[in-house]
Each structure stands twice: as structure tokens, then as C-alpha cells.
Amino acid sequence: MTDVNKTQIIDYDGHIIDNLKEWMNNNKLSKLGFNYNVIAILGSQSSGKSTLLNNLFKTSFDVMNTKLGHSQTTQGLWLSYDKFEDELTDASNEETDVEPQNKSNNKHVINPTLILDVEGNDSKERGENRLTFEHRSALFSLALADCVIVNLWYHSLGNFTASNYGLLKTVMEVHLELFHQNVNCPKTILLFTVRDWFEEFAPLDIIREKIVDEYVNKIWCELKKSENSKNANIDDYFIIEVVGLSHGIIKKDEFLKDIKRLRHKWIYELRPINYSRNIPADGFAQYCNNIWNTIIKQSQLDIPSQQEMLATFRCQEIKNNVLNHISNTIKEKMVDSKNKYIENFKTWAEKDIIEKSLNEYLTDAARYQKIICLKTLEELLENLFIQLQIIVDNNLNFTQRILSSKFSKELNSMYSICTTDKSYFLFINDQNVDVTEQDENLSNVENIGENSKKGNQIKCINLWSNFLYNADMLEYTTIANFFDQYKKCSVEIIEPSISNNEDKDSQEKRNHDFNYKNSLTILATSIYKDTNRIRSVQCNILIERIRSTIKEELKNVDNMLITVKCSKDCWDYILKIVNKLEDYIYTNLSKCFINLKTGINTTYLNNGDNIYARLNTNCDYGLGYFQNEQITDFSDDAGKNDDEMDTEIDQNKNDMESLFNSKKFEIITKQNKKEKYVSTINNDLNKEMNNKKLISELKKFYTEIIIDALKIKLDEISNNIANIIINRFESVFNYDEIDQPRQWRNISAIELKNIFRVSKDYAFLIIEILQKNIKIDKIDNYLSTNFINTDIIEKGKIKAKKRIQEICRDAQYIQETGGHMSLKNVPFAFWVILLILGWNEILMFTRLFFRLNIILPMLIGFIIIVISCLYTGNAQILSYINKIIFIVIKNLYNFYKHLQTIGHQTTKPEKVE
């Protein structure tokens, strides 16, 4: 049956067995920290080492059965432990001669001791190879043990081999080899147990003197020492203790008493308070592994390096265990963060994650080297921060999506009136618009004529003139709100302390700021895209309203074409309209275009650190990225789709410092926000209005818009050339010099012919006028001569001639006949016959109407509606009814007048002499 209280750690062949850590965990030894000790025993084979340990520490190492003969019993190295549980219940020490020097510190707790039973030396089984294993086991024991028991027989004192002189020399050489470089190395207790000692043979002091002088000091003098330890004394490295033990068989009772004294001496006098090798219990197994592997490889065994190696290994192991324990909590919160905003993240991260992880880590890791412990702790924190960063990113992504949507809605809402009101500008027929300059408010136009079209127009112009200012201030507010939310994600860390006695309030604190760049980049890019999108939409609306205004103004050209008599007058009139439109647009809308139009070559704005420059250049991180480029292309680039914007965004990658202008970013990120951000965009815009080059380019741009609208108008005129010719013809043919209708029955055929010829020439003169065969400044740069297509002219001529001939034939008919077409000429008999033949139909219609009871309900319903409206005072419905009655009566009257006109035209003409 296997004894669970002991385990083999090194087998006979010198291989380390890997179950030591499991054995220590099973026996609850791993949680001891430094509160344990290690004792090893060295001595000749079959010298009673295991028997001594079993009696001294209540262990169960295998012992030799002498009845079966002498043989090797302990093979390799074995480990057991003693928790001294019996001593905790034994309150009396009267039977001991030992004064418990360290008992006051361990009144209720006695640190357990790990006991290392080492294979005996001078073994015939190992033969010639024994020295190698003996040296290795001695080296291993000294690296681990607080105390090394050298077991020897009294009757062997004076012998070389039997007295373990060679073993002792090996021990001292190995110890010097291990600790000669370490000035503050722990002293190893060399406990000589003299077996089968009798007081009658020699006092213990004599034996002690003999061992110290003839063995220890002699060997120490013979050792080759390094420069560091050349002048060192044996007492600098060892504590020498000698005890005598009575014969275990002859004087068994005395032997047991000696054992008990030695046990108490170890517990209360010799035993260090903590493990002198400064290796925590949870790292002891790994430390043994490292030491033995280094010895086997015949490498230089450096204890500090081994301790550092162990500290690194154990701290990493503890760190990984902590991460494994806490990762599930973080992962659960991570899953939640994908679906919702994590409230109270700061408190949760500080208390439930960081503080809990640090406490769990330092509970075990604080026992190892401070530098390595703290270094690994920083790695632990870094790993936690990496995992928490994902939750922070999710939180900030929720924040940026909300802020991005809010930015877009607010900017859209601010310009909703401009989007809904698409009427043409009224300033064409009025004085110049006085645009209110915007100061710090996002919209300073609330008191301007809300219900009037003129008031809405001024409000729109004011908003457009301050678009960049509004966007800049709204951007500042949005980013400031983002950082307010971001600060809720920063965590405060109490600087870790290895000392358990340090008060938390006295410990230094530091903040960890998570990375916000990704979320801020997305937000800035979204702001950039939304601003450019809304800017593009508003620019298109502005241009469309200008075009509708130009179109409205060009309607006057239709009337001019009827009366114009020469090409110069026609084109001078058109040029006057163009100049008038250009002046009005420049005076009232230039600031709007500088705000809304991309690609305008400015001086102050493009070279400054402001939103305009960033919007007019290739932006990667939204409004903040600025390249000092100037764009002079005046093509219609007001609208760009998202794909085009994404292409621009992917073209440049820059640092976060170029996200926003430095002044704005500095104010936002300051802890003390006493300073207020003031946008300088409007000041720069006002400076730009004095830029002659900009004025020239703006006027050129306005001219292009006007000429484009003029071309469209001229195309309409070209397509309507036939009707224009006909209208010009009728204006001369049907009316005399004083604009009175001509009485064709009073005009002779020759006069009619002359009037027709003059009217026709006047009508077709418009073709030559529209061909622009003269030079007109400004218009010549955009419109060539003979711009009307020949085919259109020919088709218009054919259509116009046909209609002109019809008009002329009607006039000739009236001139020749002078007849009147009237209902009065219809015979009475016709109406009688119509009534007789249609009588059945009239009756059928009347019967159907009354059978369906339509007339009476309609009449009653109409009366009820009128009465209810009068009673309730609903003037709007009464107004509608009044309008309907008026329209019906008016149409009946017009129909009557039309019949009268036809009757007069068909009267019989008088004879012309």
C-alpha cells in the first residue's frame, strides 16, 4: 500500500519525478508560503538515517531489516513532512532541557518541516559511480535545506570514510560553490548527530570540540576559496550543532528521550522562523525541478539565478491562473457590451476586476522577488486592460453612434427650413438682403419674420452663411460629449505594494486611460461624412433655388421676344438680366457659397487650422485631418456619394494629433474646462471677402450658373420658335398701331395683304435676332453665334407659316363675307322639333333622378352644411362654398359671352364699294 505522506522525488537512476507538485497540493503544503522549513540528512549507507528521521519527525521512510541482511534501503531521494500536530496539544516542556528561544513567535502555530531522506553514500551497489551521485545529492540537499543532518557513529570518529570526512568535505565545498558570491546568503545549519554515544565514553563538549577542530575547521582551511570568500570564516556560512544520541537498542528509552530533546531543539531553537531559501511553498516543486536539472546538466548552479528563474516561472503561472479565473467574468460582460451600453463600467472594472485580480495575484506572488513580482503584475494589468479595452471600445462605439446620429439630426434640423422652402429668391425685385452675422449661437435668426416668405429667405441665407461656424461649434459639442463619456471608462489603480502592512490610503494611485482613438476616428469620420453630405445637399438646394430664381427672372425674355425689333436690343436686354443676377447673387450669396461650395481657392481658410480647410481637403479622420493643399477646380462637385468619400478617407493615414485643430482638442481634453472654445471661421470668412482673386472666381462661377440657365432658356425658345413667330405675327396682324383689334370687314383686300406682309416680316425677324450675329461681352465667352440648329429653324418656319396662313384665311373670310354666327339665326321650329324628338329622353332622365331620390337629399344636405357652418362660424368651408358658386356662375357667364362673340362674327358683312 502506498504511503501518501512520503514521495520519491529523485529515483535511483537520477531522474526527477514530476509528481511533487501534486503531492504537495494533496497534502495541503502548497499554501504555506514561506512558513515551512526543509531538513535533509546525509550519511553512510545503513547508518540509521531513515530510522532517525522516522523517530524524530514521525515519518515512515523505509528502514533496513537487519534480519534479512544488510542492503541498500533508501534509493534516490525521498520527501516527507511533519506538521508537529502533537506539539500543538502538548503544552508542557518540563521534560525538555531546551529553552524555547522562538516559542513566543510560534505559540499557536509551528511551521511544518519537509524532510529529505537522501540515499546513503559509500554504497557498494553504486560502486565506482557513487561519487557522482553523492556529489549531486549533496549539492541538491544544500540548495534546498535549512538544516543538513550529518549522521555518524561515535566509534567512527577518527576514521576517514566511516566518519563521513569525505562527505563533510563535499558538503562544505558544495556550499561554498553555491553561496560564495552571495554575501547575505542564509546560514546552513550543520547538525552532527553522533549515534551510539555514551556519556561514560566522553562528554558531549569534547566530541563537539573534536568535530569542529579536526573536521570542520580543518576542511575549511583546506578548501580553495575565491577572492570574495578568501578571508571568510566558517561561521559566516554554517551554524554548527552537535548532539549525541544514545544507543537505539541497548538504551532505547534514553534514545527516545534524546530524540525528543532534539525534536524540541529543532522546533524551538534551531528552526528558522521562515524558509531560509526564500522559496514559497507553491514554487518549491518547480524549484526542485530547476535545481536538479541544472545539476544533471553539470551547469554552474547559481542559487540567485535559480530563485529568479523560479520567481519568473511562478509569477507567470500565478498571473495565468488569475487571468483564467477572471476571464470568464470579463467575457460575460464583453458579450453584454455588444448588445447594450455597460453602465457603471468604472466601478465594476476597478472593484470586480482589477482590485480582485491584484489581490489574488499578490496573495501568492508577493512571496517571490519583488522586481519580478511587480514586473509580472504589470503584465497582468496590461492583459486585463487589453480585455477591458474591448468593452471600452463597445461602450465608446455606442457613444459615438449616438453622438454621430445626434450630430446629423441636429445639423439637419437646423437646416430643415432651407430644405423644405424651395421657392425662388425674392431679392431680385427687392433691395439687398441684410444677413445677420452669427456670433456664438448656432442659429441667430429666430426673430426674423417667421410667417413671411421673405423672412424664411433671410433665415436660410443666414444659416447658409454660417454653415461652417454651426458645424464647427456642433462638432466641438459632440467631441466634448464623447470625452465626457470616455472619462467614465478610465479606471483608477492603487499602486501595488508587496508589504501587507501598508495602509491603502497611503498608497499612490494612478489612472489608466484606455485607447479611444478607434472610436473617436469613427466618430470624426462620421461627422466629416455627415457634414459634407449635409453641406452638399444644402449647396445643391442653394444652387437649385438660384436656378429657379434665374428661371423666374428670364421669363421676362418671353415678353421681350414679342416686341423686340433688333438683335442689339434683344441681347442688351439679356446681358442686363445676366449682370443684374450676378450682382445680386454676389452681394447676397457669396458668403453662402464660401461656406457650402467645395473646391473654392481661399487664402485664409485653406491655410488655417479650421474646419473649412479640413472639409476641402482629403480627410482620413474626418474634420480633423488637414493637408495644406489648395483646390482650384470649379466643376460642380457639390455632391459626393459615400463611396467617393470612402475612397478619399482611405487615401491618407495620419496620427490622432491631426484629428482636430490643436486649440479645440486642447480645450476638450483639459481637466479644467474654464477656457471656452471660440471659432474663428467667420472672421476668416470676412477676410476672404476682400480677396480679389476669390471675388473674381466667384463671379466667374456665378456667371457660369446664369449662362447655364440662359442656355436652357434659349433651348426652350428654340424649341418654341414656331409659337414665338406666331405670337409676333398676331401682335402686328390682329392689332393696329394703337393696340386695337382690327375690324376686317372695314379693311380692303389690298390693305389686308400689306398688313400680312408686314406682320410676316416682323414675325420671322426673330430668327435673325436670336442667332446673335453681334458681339456681346461676357455672353460671347459661353454662347456662339448661330447657336440655333438649322433643322429646328426650318421646322419652326413650316409650322409657323401654316398657322399664319390659317389666321390670314380667317381674316379674309370675315373681310369678304362680314357674316355673323349667332344662335339668334337658328329657326324657332328647330327648337320645337328638338323638344319633341327628345321628350322621351328628358322624361326618362327626370324619372331616374327622382326615383333614386338624389335631388332632395342633395338639397337637404347642402342646406344642413350651410346652416351648420353659419352656426359654428366655420368661415373656411363657407369660403369654399362661395368660391364654388362663384366659379360656376363665372364659367356660365363666360360661356354665354363666347356664344355672343360667335354670333357677332357670323353676321352678314356689308358690301364694299
UniProtKB/Swiss-Prot annotation:
Residues 1-825, 871-913 are cytoplasmic. Its main location: endoplasmic reticulum. Its EC number is 3.6.5.-. Residues 847-849 are lumenal. GO terms for cellular component: endoplasmic reticulum membrane. It is a multi-pass membrane protein. Keywords: Endoplasmic reticulum, GTP-binding, Hydrolase, Membrane, Nucleotide-binding, Transmembrane, Transmembrane helix. Probable GTP-binding protein involved in generating and maintaining the structure of the tubular endoplasmic reticulum network. This is Protein SEY1 homolog. It comes from Plasmodium berghei (strain Anka). The gene is SEY1.
